[in-house]
Swiss-Prot record:
Effect on the protein upon substituting T406E: Greatly reduced phosphorylation. Transports uncoated endocytic vesicles to clusters at distinct peripheral sites and alters actin filament structure
SMART domains: MYSc
Region (Three-helix bundle): 836-917
PTM field: Phosphorylation in the motor domain, induced by EGF, results in translocation of MYO6 from the cell surface to membrane ruffles and affects F-actin dynamics. Phosphorylated in vitro by p21-activated kinase (PAK).
Localization (cell): Golgi apparatus, trans-Golgi network membrane; Golgi apparatus; Nucleus; Cytoplasm, Perinuclear region
Name used for this protein in its record: Unconventional myosin-VI
Organism placement in taxonomy: Eukaryota, Metazoa, Chordata, Craniata, Vertebrata
Entry-annotated residues carrying Phosphothreonine: T406
Main location, first listed in the record: Golgi
Length: 1254
């Protein structure tokens, strides 16, 4: 198959493996892996892709690959990753693979300088190139830009964000202190907002949108950081292998002895908020020695430090203090930050126990007294007793007649007191983080800003064994960002192509709007259902979950936990969780604490206490919040509720509005493995990331896409000031055309739309050259345009003169041709009218010539000479009379023949009489010769008659064929008229089927992603997935295939499991008519599927293989024939032998040959419904001969009805006409060789040739 060319086929762990096609199945291909010769496996045909011939080759832009598909995309990334080339383009989108180690000099200052002002594609792929492109787009287009850095947790988003910021400030900063502050703000934000998770050692547990603002001179003037959704639950509890926020550990590891004593710090295992997770520090050999022993936990002393090339708690503490100083924080403010952090730690050590009294409340444990003192008096500025009371009781106000009445203190149970303590800790830390962000923003203020470049770094799609409200919000955010990506890159791009008339093929992608509606829809969305639950007097997580399931019981995106592919999730009760099918896969959320985590308000006594702190810094932390939420709190007197979910939704919508108002660049970060180790490439999970991030859809779009564009007027206005008057009068479109021609651009690299010019992927340098607004550069380009216009106009004059001469010659040639045609037609008409008389005169004239021989015989006679002479004379008179009659009257062929026969008879009688008179041998010999000549004449006459009859028979057959075609055409029209009456119903049914098939395909695609995500969770959590989930989704059948298999079940023969070779052998050897018909049908159906696969996966910039003329294939696509059962089709055709001939021109020559000099002919011989022999005749190449069996892959795979040849006027020819051409081109020998080598399939043609050879 495919001449042994390699293909990519699915592999469970590597994503794809290379192999060869060895057989074609009903809807799958049999693949033999190259590294496992002799072993084969089945792969769905739409999951098999052609491979590049050079497996070690890599390209910087995946759009440069010969084959553009997800397998070659994955392989190219893998090859580059193995060479430490972690960046790759897909058009203007950057794919960044996390290397998990430091690559030397890749981010050095020298590297930054090398990318400044360089067009995308002129330098190797890099995050700096995207940053520079965003800056140049902002400068040229006068439009703010955004860079969206996305990817899973641990994929490298935070690091790439830092590199973008560093590049912009170093390259285009003013050289002042503000540039350093923007860069130095990152360590501070990371310390308070990043933490170690199981999938990322430096995971951002909040989202941020960093704006770098520029003035009118495109210099950095300031910045602004917006933050979203800090993960507050991490403050109180973490997973076993996870840590709290970095600041806690860095403070314990790196604080000086003075600070440690003032803040009463010790090792992490002594604090409740740290000791339930990992208590080890990040450190290297040097810093490990600098950390004092009393600051190390037992776990650290036993297992050693955590290792990460980018993290070091002791060193990072020092770097954080340096960053604080650079952004303007003095020692007092720095100590305030540390004091609040330590206060949160000590707050977590306050513990409770049941009270001995009957009140049902609780008291502080004795061992918590010191923690209470440290936290209240020394760190947070609170009264110990007030804090104790506020943590163990809750203040309620009775109401009477709508007015507030008596204050009642309600004792809290131990669990409630623990929740109150944790809520206070989360609130304090959250306000502290808000303060850090505000101080960061204050350190780089700006008065005026012309434009900005925003860099979005937000937590990637998260999926753990246990997922809660935080993961729900993060994944909701990622759904919205994926939709923005779909809109900006796929939807808006395709709408623009369609609007501009570029003719780019449509690319389908998964629309996740239904998932977003499920979460945020008004009243019925999960967020609104959760808010409604929070407003109830006694809200519960179980009631909220049940309400969600009830309102969306038939929603495709929402499911119950027991349908999960992971066994651990199937144990979750109906009212304790739900599954949402996200764009990246299904995630099971445990709804315990959803209600609690959605409420951002403290109960009244704690809120009042913290707002009235004696510490000025603490009061300032809560003052801004108090002012902002004043109205909310007044309402909260009753409900005490501030919705976290809806607050986040509002922030997210504002962010997306900002993104939509800017130009967008995308960096897709990829996590190469789950172990976070270097040089380890897990193909399957990387492929899943590429598919979920839309890279495969982008690759499909970019096969014919144009990522760069500019409007004609925009380009024209840029050059207008530099144009002389004669050029200024040019139409903008014409000016752009002249500009591109002057630059010598290849027409393949760009395309003109209605209002814009578009550039192919990889042509950003050419685009930037045109859009460069440097005055000297503009003047140079204008000079080139002027030169090109002069040359083009002179060439146009030359071409016009040549065209006029050609036109004159063509008119003269056509006039001569018309005269020649008229002469020929008149000659033919005249010949048809007078040919019987001319033929008669020729025959009678021949008879007259024989009279001389008669006279010679008579003159030699001795007796009866006079009598014989008279008879000869009479015969001559009769002949002359007949000749005169033929010339003077319009006699028919029959009349002439009758009188001619009479003369022949008379001459025969006369000859007989002469024979009697002539006795001598000499005379007898001469008479014998005359007899022979007459016999020859008779035979010639008979042959002429036979030829004439044959011509008449052929004319009759052609007339019958034409009449039959007209009859078939009339019957077809009648059928069409009948079909039109039910067409509306049929189309509606087909539309429903297509919609159902599309929905089913979306379900299958979503299930595939769900399974892949479950596998990745299973790998990371050492969990087993269900047997049902283990079933290979690659062999799940689509609706069309299921329908085919269902139909096959009703047939006599089930051929779905037969191999391609078995079908072929059965066709060649079987005598069972029904089996033969079924095998032929299945054989050609598989051929169609295989050729469709080849056409879809052809090389870039290559024409589709033509096994039949375009008119035939187009007809088959536009008019799908009704599929008759194979047996019925064979009977209806009755193995008729039909022959066809139609003009044929290769698509590559279609527009290069206006004179049709390369037009050839396509001949086909159909044996019943299927083709048996095929010929292509071209004027500039040898004839192409094909026979069924030997050349199935190159022959037309359509049946006769599908080709529409029987409906083409003049297409059908006589068998003799086909056989003459076939024999002349060496077809007999070709077919004989195929028969002798047992490659030809038994057909009418093979049987006839074998009989002829016998």
């Amino acid at each position: 198959m495919e001449d042994g060319k390699p293909v990519w086929a699915p592999h469970p762990t590597d994503g794809f493996q290379v192999g060869n096609i060895v057989d074609i199945g009903p809807d799958s291909l049999t693949i033999e892996p190259l590294n496992q010769k002799g072993k084969t496996f089945l792969a769905l045909i739409n999951q098999v892709f052609p491979a590049e011939e050079d497996s070690k080759k890599d390209v910087e832009d995946n759009c440069s690959l010969m084959y553009l598909n997800e397998a070659t995309l994955l392989h190219n990334i893998k090859v580059r990753y193995s060479k430490d080339r972690i960046y790759t383009y897909v058009a203007n989108i950057l794919i960044a693979v996390n290397p998990y180690f430091d690559i030397p000099k890749i981010y050095s200052s020298e590297t930054i300088k090398s990318y400044q002002g360089k067009s995308l594609g002129t330098m190797p792929p890099h995050v700096f190139a995207i940053a520079d492109k965003a800056f140049r787009d902002m400068k040229v287009l006068k439009l703010s830009q955004s860079i969206i850095v996305s990817g899973e947790s641990g994929a490298g988003k935070t690091e790439n964000t830092k590199f973008v910021l560093r590049y912009l400030t170093e390259s285009y900063g003013t050289g002042q202190d503000i540039d350093d502050r923007i860069v130095e703000a990152n360590p501070l934000l990371e310390a308070f907002g990043n933490a170690k998770t199981v999938r990322n050692n430096n995971s951002s547990r909040f989202g941020k949108f960093v704006e770098i603002h520029f003035n009118e001179k495109s210099s950095v003037v300031g910045g602004f950081v917006s933050h979203y959704l800090l993960e507050k639950s991490r403050i109180c509890v973490q997973g076993k292998e996870e840590r709290n926020y970095h600041i806690f550990y860095r403070l314990c590891a790196g604080a000086s002895e003075d600070i440690r004593e003032r803040l009463h710090l010790s090792s992490p295992d002594n604090f409740r908020y740290l000791n339930r997770g990992c208590t080890r520090y990040f450190a290297n050999k040097e810093t490990d020695k600098q950390i004092l022993q009393n600051r190390k936990s037992p776990e650290y002393l036993k297992a050693g430090s955590l290792k990460d090339p980018l993290l070091d708690d002791h060193g990072d503490f020092i770097r954080m203090c340096t960053a604080m100083k650079k952004i303007g924080l003095d020692d007092e403010e720095k100590l305030d930050l540390f004091r609040v952090v330590a206060g949160v730690l000590h707050l977590g050590n306050i513990d409770f126990e049941e009270a001995g009294s009957t009140s049902g409340g609780c008291n502080l444990k004795n061992k918590s007294t010191q923690a209470l003192e440290y936290c209240a008096e020394k760190l947070l500025g609170l009264d110990q007793d007030d804090l104790r009371v506020s943590l163990t009781t809750r203040v309620m106000l009775t109401t009477a007649g709508g007015a507030k009445g008596t204050v009642i203190k309600v004792p809290l149970k131990v669990e409630q007191a623990n929740n109150a303590r944790d809520a206070l800790a989360k609130t304090v830390y959250s306000h502290l983080f808000d303060h850090v962000v505000n101080r960061v923003n204050q350190c780089f203020p700006f008065e005026t800003s012309s434009y900005f470049i925003g860099v979005l770094d937000i937590a990637g799609f998260e999926y753990f064994e246990h997922n809660s409200f935080e993961q729900f919000c993060i994944n909701y955010c990622n759904e919205k960002l994926q939709q923005f990506f779909n809109e900006r890159i796929l939807k808006e791009e395709q709408e623009l192509y369609q609007k501009e008339g570029l003719g780019v093929n449509e690319v389908h992608y998964v629309d996740n709007q239904d998932c977003i509606d499920l979460i945020e829809a008004r009243l019925v969305g999960i967020l609104d259902i959760l808010d409604e639950e929070n407003r109830l007097p006694q809200p519960s997580d179980q009631h909220f979950t049940s309400a969600g399931h009830q309102k969306h019981k038939d929603h495709f995106r929402l499911s119950i936990p027991r349908k999960s592919k992971l066994a651990i999730h199937r144990n979750i009760a109906y009212d304790e969780g739900f599954i949402i099918r996200h764009f990246a896969g299904a995630v099971c959320y445990e709804t315990t604490q959803f209600v609690e985590k959605n409420n951002d308000a403290l109960h009244m006594s704690l809120e009042s206490l913290i707002c009235e702190s004696r510490d000025k810094f603490i009061r300032e932390l809560f003052e801004s919040s108090t002012n902002n939420n004043k109205d909310t709190k007044q309402k909260a007197g009753k409900l005490s509720f501030i919705s976290v979910g809806n607050k986040f939704k509002t922030q997210l919508n504002l962010l997306l509005d900002k993104l939509r108002s800017t130009g967008a660049s995308f960096i897709r970060c990829i996590k190469p493995n789950l172990k976070m180790t270097s040089h380890h490439f897990e193909g399957a999970q990387i492929l899943s990331q590429l598919q979920c991030s839309g890279m495969v859809s982008v690759l499909d779009l970019m096969q014919g896409g144009f990522p760069s564009r500019a409007s004609f007027h925009e380009v024209y206005n840029m050059y207008k000031k530099s144009l002389p008057d004669k050029l200024a009068r040019l139409d903008p479109r014409l000016f752009c055309k002249a500009l591109f021609k002057a630059l010598g651009l290849n027409e393949i690299d760009y395309k003109f739309g209605l209002t814009k010019v578009f550039f192919r992927p990889g042509k950003f340098a050419e685009f930037d050259q045109i859009m460069k607004s440097d005055p000297d550069h503009l003047a140079e380009l204008v000079k080139r345009v002027n030169h090109w216009l002069i040359c083009s106009r002179w060439k146009k004059v030359q071409w016009c003169s040549l065209s006029v001469i050609k036109l004159k010659n063509k008119i003269k040639y056509r006039a001569e041709a018309c005269i020649k045609m008229q002469k020929t037609i008149r000659m033919w008409l005249c010949k048809r009218r007078h040919k019987p008389r001319i033929d008669g005169l020729v025959k009678v004239g021949t008879l007259k010539k024989r009279l001389d021989k008669f006279n010679e015989v008579v003159s030699a006679l001795k007796d009866g000479k006079q009598e014989m002479s008279k008879q000869v004379k009479d015969l001559e008179i009769s002949i002359d009379a007949l000749m005169a009659k033929i010339k003077s009257t319009m006699m028919t062929r029959e009349q002439i023949q009758k009188e001619y026969d009479a003369l022949v008879k008379s001459s025969a009688v006369l000859l007989s009489a002469l024979q009697k008179k002539k006795q001598q041998e000499e005379e007898a010999e001469r008479l014998r010769r005359i007899q022979e000549e007459m016999e020859k004449e008779r035979k010639r006459r008979e042959e002429d008659e036979q030829r004439r009859r044959k011509e008449e028979e052929e004319r009759r057959m052609k007339l019958e064929m034409e009449a039959k075609r007209k009859q078939e055409e009339e019957e077809r029209k009648k059928r069409e008229d009948d079909e039109k009456r039910i067409q509306a119903e049929v189309e509606a049914q087909l539309a429903r089927q297509r919609e159902e098939e599309s929905q089913q395909q979306a379900v299958l695609e979503q299930e595939r992603r769900d399974r892949e995500l479950a596998l990745r969770i299973a790998q990371s959590e050492a969990e087993l997935i269900s047997d049902e989930a283990q079933a290979d989704p690659g062999l799940r059948r689509g609706p069309a295939v299921q329908a085919t298999k269902a139909a096959a079940g009703t047939k006599k023969y089930d051929l779905s499991k037969w191999k391609y070779a078995e079908l072929r052998d059965t066709i060649n050897t079987s005598c069972d008519i029904e089996l033969l018909a079924a095998c032929r049908e299945e054989f050609h159906r598989r051929l169609k599927v295989y050729h469709a696969w080849k056409s879809k996966n052809k090389k870039r910039n290559t024409e589709t293989e033509q096994r039949a003329p375009k008119s035939v294939t187009d007809y088959a696509q536009q008019n799908p024939a009704v599929q008759l059962p194979a047996r019925q089709q064979e009977i209806e055709m009755n193995r008729q032998q039909r022959f066809f001939r139609i003009p044929f021109i290769r698509s590559a020559d279609q527009y290069k040959d206006p004179q049709n000099k390369k037009k050839g002919w396509w001949y086909a011989h159909f044996d019943g419904p299927w083709i048996a022999r095929q010929m292509e005749l071209h004027p500039d190449k040898p004839p192409i001969l094909l026979v069924a069996g030997k050349d199935d892959m190159e022959m037309c795979e359509l049946n006769l009805e599908e080709t529409g040849l029987t409906r083409k006027r003049g297409a059908e020819i006589l068998p003799r006409q086909f056989e003459e051409i076939w024999e002349r081109c060496g077809g007999i020998q070709y077919l004989q060789n195929a028969i002798e080598s047992r490659q030809a399939r038994p057909t009418y043609a093979t049987a006839m040739l074998q009989n002829l050879l016998k």
